[in-house]
Regions:
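Anion-binding (especially nucleotide phosphate/pyrophosphate-binding) glycine-rich loop
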Residues: 1-139, 143, 147-149
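Long, positively charged amphipathic alpha-helical accessory segments at protein N-termini or as interdomain linkers
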Residues: 154-179
C-alpha cells in the first residue's frame, strides 16, 4: 500500500503530543484509498482507528498495534440552486473551523455559532457538535460513509444518523465502523 509507515510515533498526530508508535499508519485522500487501507488491515488482521486532527484523542505511550488511518479527505463544493438555496459538500478531512470561516465569508449563515470548535468535518456528525443553540445536525442533509468492516458505501439521511445532544448513530457499537 502506497505511503504506508510502520512504527510511526503517534505524538506527531495529536494535539496533546502524546502517544507511542502505531504499528502501521497511512493517509487517505479518497474512497479508493480508504478501501485499500481497509483491505490491508484485514490482510494483516489488525484493528483500525481513523484519526483526523487528533484533538480530544489520547494514545497510550505503548502505542497502537494496528492501522491508524489519517483522514485527509478534502473537498469543498458549493451548489446554488435557481431559488437561491446553497448546498455545500465538504470532505471529512477538512478543518471544521476553516469551513465555518469560509461559509461566513461567503455569506452562508448557520455555522457561525460553531466557530473555534477543533477537529475535522468528519468528526462533527459523530459528536453532533454544537454551541450557542446550534448543533451541526441542524445543518446536515446527509453523511456519506464507508463501513470499515464490509467496505460498503452508504449515504445516511439525518434520520439514519440518529442525532441527539452530543450523540449520533456513529458513536454506537453498530455505527462505530463507519468512516
Amino acid at each position: 500500500m502506497k505511503g504506508l509507515l510502520e512504527h510511526e510515533p503517534l505524538q506527531k498526530y495529536t494535539t496533546l503530543k502524546v502517544g507511542g508508535p502505531a504499528r502501521y499508519l497511512c493517509a487517505v485522500s479518497d474512497i479508493s484509498q480508504v478501501q485499500q487501507a481497509r483491505d490491508f488491515a484485514r490482510q494483516q488482521n489488525v484493528p483500525v482507528v481513523v484519526l483526523g486532527h487528533g484533538s480530544n484523542v489520547f494514545f497510550s505511550e505503548a502505542g497502537f498495534d494496528g492501522l491508524v488511518i489519517l483522514n485527509e479527505m478534502k473537498q469543498r463544493a458549493y451548489d446554488t440552486s435557481s431559488n437561491g438555496v446553497t448546498r455545500a459538500t465538504f470532505g471529512s478531512g477538512e478543518d471544521f473551523d476553516e469551513i465555518v470561516a469560509e461559509t461566513v465569508s461567503r455569506g452562508l449563515w448557520g455555522l457561525e455559532n460553531l466557530s473555534h470548535i477543533p477537529g475535522t468535518v468528519g468528526a462533527t456528525p459523530v459528536q453532533n457538535v454544537g454551541a450557542y443553540g446550534v448543533e451541526v445536525s441542524d445543518l446536515i442533509d446527509s453523511v456519506s460513509a464507508v463501513d470499515l468492516e464490509t467496505g460498503k458505501e452508504k449515504v445516511f439521511t439525518t434520520r439514519e444518523c440518529q442525532f441527539a445532544y452530543r450523540d449520533s448513530y456513529f458513536k454506537t457499537d453498530e455505527g462505530r465502523n463507519w468512516f
